[in-house]
Swiss-Prot record:
This is Transmembrane protein 237A. Disruption phenotype: Fishes lacking both tmem237a and tmem237b display defects in midsomitic embryos, including shortening of the anterior-posterior axis and small anterior structures, kinking of the notochord, and broadening and thinning of the somite. Belongs to the TMEM237 family. GO terms for cellular component: ciliary transition zone; membrane. Residues 1-11, 43-64, 74-87 have a biased composition (Basic and acidic residues). InterPro entries: TMEM237. It comes from the Eukaryota. Its main location: membrane. Component of the transition zone in primary cilia. Required for ciliogenesis.
Amino acid sequence: MCVTSRADKMPSVKPKKKKIKKEINEVEEPEAGPEPAIEMEGLESRRQSESREPLTPEPHDNPPLKKKKKKKTHTFENEGEQQDHPNGDVQESPTDGEEVTKKSKKKRKNKMMENQSHNELGVEEDDIITDVHAPISQRSLFSAPLSHSHPIGKVFVEKNRRFQATDLSHDHLEEYMEVRPMWNTRDVAMRVHSGFRIIGLFSHGFLAGYAVWNIIVVYVLAGEQMTTLPNLLQQYHSLAYPAQSLLYLLLAISTVSAFDRVNLAKASMALRGFLTLDPAALASFLYFAALILSLSQQMTSDRIHLYPTANETLWPPGLEHQILQPWIVVNLVVALLVGLAWVFVATRPDMDYTEEFLMAMEVEEYPRHDDKHELAA
């Protein structure tokens, strides 16, 4: 009875082994399909990450298809082997099931590691650029826009550390006007000097003409060899004071203007100009000499102005020639000096050393009261 019971129990074990093997083969077959594809995708992603060339879609080559076909043939071979054993008589040790389960676990672990590496090194389809790169324009990237700017009727005012747009009205134009800087001492000196130089140029020319006219009138009234001096006194005594006053005024302005060109603020520079016969220095010297000579004959001009027929104390008879001859000669010399000085000035009217000195002068600007308050704030 014991033998028969054991014999009855043994055939019941064999179909269980077949089922276990069939289940294992079914587990292996679906897992064997995507494995090579995953491996190829991992290799392709690694190659794309290692090469720094622009990403372009790579066409699917035939090698993965061949591998799939090989895998399919392998599965067909496995099925053929299973068909060779219709009865399911497979000579395997009882530990084959445990080894298959261990292999499946290892394969799953390897698949998990490959999936993680594929996720880390893989390239998404959105990152692949299929379009051809457009050529970059040769213009600079920071070039100014070609469109013209148009004025707008708004002004941005900073309030509470923020810029706010406000409408620009005519009432607020005065507030946004540019404030002109205040004049300093140098600016005032430059303006005064330029204005006085224009007046001086006019006085130089007018003095030269007036001195020549004055000496011509005196010689005409005195006659040849000064024989008609009483006629000169009678005709010229009403013009003596105005003529001499105007001559003195023009000589004073011309002398100051000539010395103003020499820049007497630097004595060494002025002395060098006199020694080198500079035109501005020579003109100033000639005007100064003419002014001194004109002042030396001021008493004679007073006598001519006070000439009466009844006053014999100022003009005793017979002394007209002795009094008037030096006065006429001095006026002639003054006319010559003034004319020569005007020629020197006219040759170089733009030469002005004082203006150059003022331009090079540095002025210390002191802060205003408004600036002090701003600095304190």
